[in-house]
């Protein structure tokens, strides 16, 4: 019933743009709005909407749809693969990536509107096909950005008015991959629309746990859908609606040749080959956004209502999980978020542009967990018998987030701009807190081709509510799942001071280079780990944290040649775990209480780059990743273990692509592509199964050959 009500709500939300003009009767008349007028008005409103937000003083990187299409794989890859080409983006297992030493500090926005966090771990909610352009805003962020501090991914969606038509694509190849997809956009009178969808299946849904190209039990089926519709009411107003869906099923991959090591017996069975384990996880996300934009002279305002439903279900192997882990946990979580966001900009004069906004979000979190465990003797700790018992934990919780900001973009001199403001955030969930955060950024352009930025931001980042657990530890006393540590302090919001200094230099009209540096000092630094069989990340706090680093970037554009390169170095450390302690060993907690350790997602050296060349209808492309490796535990000769004290070996991955447009062969709209992923077939570890909050070993993808055919119409 929950899901049915939500689906009806999203459907109604999608239909609203069509109903509004009828209700307003005379507001919009397609006979008096020629197509060209609508297109020009849409372009004007897009430009005005972009003025609501400012990136003054922040580090901003832009990837447009042409750049995505030009890379190996094009828009057939998942979103995380596109984002790995952002400076200082370190890849991790489960499709995660970490920007500037932050575990999960990313906030997605669609046309400037916040998309609340979801529960999904492996699944990618947003397909790259919806992107007209993607802005990654990092560093010292202006006051309109909050709640997440590592980076803002603001996606400008395709609309259909500026580039009508569509495509149908069939893509597939290695690892049993097959992915049909489509997109279509157009206009009719004052209405414009864009839709896209795909169905992905392959046998490498999650990273291989043993480095093989054919991991056991690793099939995935995924559906992604997205739709955008807008109604231009008049030259100053428009209503737009967005709906999206991601539905993904994953098999949890198995290791080969393993046997249970706990010495347990379940219903008379004590052996269980790891090849026979059968764990599965399903992740579903649905969202809808309805927006009204008004632009008149110096004033532009956009107000939106939004809803997001996210569910995750894990089905264990009932016997195998008990034998290997001492617990078989059937878990279901659902988080529904409702929100209101309103942002406005007013150009007071040539020197001052004022911006202000508010954001409200209400979440409900429902959790059903049924854990099968074995009872143990309270004195010996040994199982009483081999008969599983069930522990049921159902819970309902809620969260409220309230935010507001005001800021002024002040052009002090022709070559100097200051953006300063205040932001207030308050949240109330498993814990509560609030903060008034000052922000100030400067941009100095001493020469036409030189831009320097300097900024300070105070950040307040609540823990991801949808991931916070609510286990009652006492229920697991005298069972095979009893934690060694019984302390479970609530996760708190991270508070930090952030400093950023950078420079960008246009060497020529074709070549641009940049340098950026940053330093973050945090209290109650939020990190996440994967504990137990359900692949659900759990947040926890380090009492103290520091993150700092440097970035070098370069890009070159001339004719049909485009090239870029990024190099980053970072250090991310934390001390004293002060929440969710029951997930850790007592020895681990004791060491971290007295020592700063590297965060498990720190990668000290990260590099990426790519190039593409268009020649007579054929595009040749290549990109690469290089990393010094994420952290792992260090085992000393005397037997002492240092959490996250080592890092995995350096790795590189090189990808190639060739795409040809058959226009000159008389086949209008037909293109074909060949992509080679991991050209050199490098076998490299992303995780080795050790480290704070690290789950199973996982490896990067082995060499894969993929083919695609696209017909435009």
Each model region followed by its residue ranges:
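N-terminal periplasmic "start-of-domain" segments of outer-membrane beta-barrel proteins
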Residues: 37-73, 104-107, 134
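Gram-negative outer-membrane beta-barrel transporters
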Residues: 413, 513-521, 540-636
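Conserved C-terminal beta-signal and adjacent last beta-strands/turns
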Residues: 11, 185, 230-234, 596-713
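Membrane-embedded beta-barrel scaffold of Gram-negative outer-membrane proteins
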Residues: 295-316, 445, 467, 489-559, ...
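Short acidic/polar hinge/loop motifs at secondary-structure boundaries
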Residues: 113-139
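Transmembrane beta-barrel wall of Gram-negative outer-membrane proteins
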Residues: 172-201, 212-253, 280-300, 348-349
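N-terminal periplasmic accessory domains that precede
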Residues: 79-82, 97, 121-122, 136, ...
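Extracytoplasmic beta-strand/coil segments of soluble accessory domains associated
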Residues: 79-115, 132
